[in-house]
UniProtKB/Swiss-Prot annotation:
It catalyses: heme b + (2E,6E)-farnesyl diphosphate + H2O = Fe(II)-heme o + diphosphate. The gene is ctaB. It comes from the Bacteria. It comes from Leptospira biflexa serovar Patoc (strain Patoc 1 / ATCC 23582 / Paris). It is found in: Cell inner membrane. Pathway: Porphyrin-containing compound metabolism; heme O biosynthesis; heme O from protoheme: step 1/1. This is Protoheme IX farnesyltransferase. The chain crosses the membrane at residues 13-33, 35-55, 84-104, 106-126, 134-154, 163-183, 205-225, 229-249, 264-284. CDD domains: PT_UbiA_Cox10. NCBIfam families: cyoE_ctaB (TIGR01473), PRK04375.1-2 (NF003349).
Amino acid sequence: MFRLWNQLTKPRVTVLVLATVLPGMYLGTTGYPSLTVISITLFGTYLMSSASFILNQYIERERDAVMYRTKQRPIPAGEISPTFALLLGIVVAIVSFGILTYFINLLTAVCALAALLLYVFLYTIWLKPRTEQNIVIGGISGCIGPLIGYAAMANALPMQAWVMFLMIFLWTPAHFWALAIFLKDDYEFAGIPMMPVVSGIEKTVNQIFLYAIAYSLSVIGFYFVDDRMGYLFLLSAIVLTVLILGFAYRLKLSMDKVLAKRFFFFSILHLFLVSIAIVIDSKI
């Protein structure tokens, strides 16, 4: 059962979501956030993220069955029924909303629920099967982590929270398009219009490079938005910017699928390190 839960809920992806919640929590209070509030907020967010992925796999069960990467997921593999997955996703989402509303505040719960609704309805159902820009618009759902964190501490969403939202919004296309390059044949076989399938790898790597530039500018720009950010964050942002732009430029020149996969994983590490830098510098 634990194995099936992990396959349904993508815990490794959820860890990154939770990592983007923490900076919002640390910026949302003048002191240190309560360990109890942190734990409940992260647990509630974990449940809502898990519900999103369960419902995503319910909706995509037929596409998953024809893709090599996903055909062994629990629903297409016949290990659980679609009806059970649907009910499980709904119940987990309700539990998450209840926990966040009762123990934290309604704004936090609404932000978490908005992330689920955007991911399930806007991205999975509407955009993903229809346009190569699916991840640009649909990726909004993955940007809400800082809003959840800030709302949990301040019960408000000031400019700093929205700049962090923008940061992740600009990070998302380069991150996912790199994976789409590596999995181009799989997406093409399943008829999913990811950018490498529709427009080719050359256009995709050019777009990755442009989004990497925009994302890097937003990271450095955060230093000027929040006066709690000091030279530690600025130095970290500059070093990380040089690294990701260098990586994106190499990918632009080579158009290599293996390098695209490496960029995908590096971008995860990059966002994680940016989040850590924000957390540390906000309290020293």
